[in-house]
């Protein structure tokens, strides 16, 4: 059984980043990975999970980036070398996402496809409309309302028939580099909320997760904001390349004592990366 706090952190992050997101999330979710040196050209990532009593085969992911550090493709493979997920992104001026295609293999259903199309204003400074298709059929679309300085105020979301189904309202927390998105049904009933970075190329963290960084600026300890001494946490150890980017990351379940002292380390995940640069 997973410790309660670890399950809570994992569930929280999955909710924040999952595809069941507000429409604005298709634009605000990070499409890049930050390099501490030169811009990434490609990353080949292998991940192994270690759980007592379970044998889980490693997975491999290959990512490619443009010269601005934005992902152009991401392909995930199972242990047999078969593709299980594909993501392809297209940009204007290298930075403005205009199309994102995701193909995922789902058991008993086969390949499922999602396409996102983003329409920008004439200066490519802010999106005006987002349309999402699932398996070739229009699923939802959204039109955005901005203020005088081009900050999102709200979005009106429509279903495949053109009916208004949701309204998304935005609150900015500049000091934390965060936008909080509150979603309401067409009748005004609250439906949920999500959090995104204002600038995904700068550091940010979710409100409910507390992080301690190592001297290289990577997360070393991660726990819930209200955690106390003795609670469970995640602890990370890294190896780095000459650019300052990690090439091996080990994730441990740990107990925290006073002063963030780590005890009872249990290896949960090991990820290695082969990186090339522009």
What are these regions (language model features)?
Residues 1-25:
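Bacterial Sec-dependent N-terminal signal peptides
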Residues 21-278:
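Buried hydrophobic residues that stabilize the cores of well-folded domains
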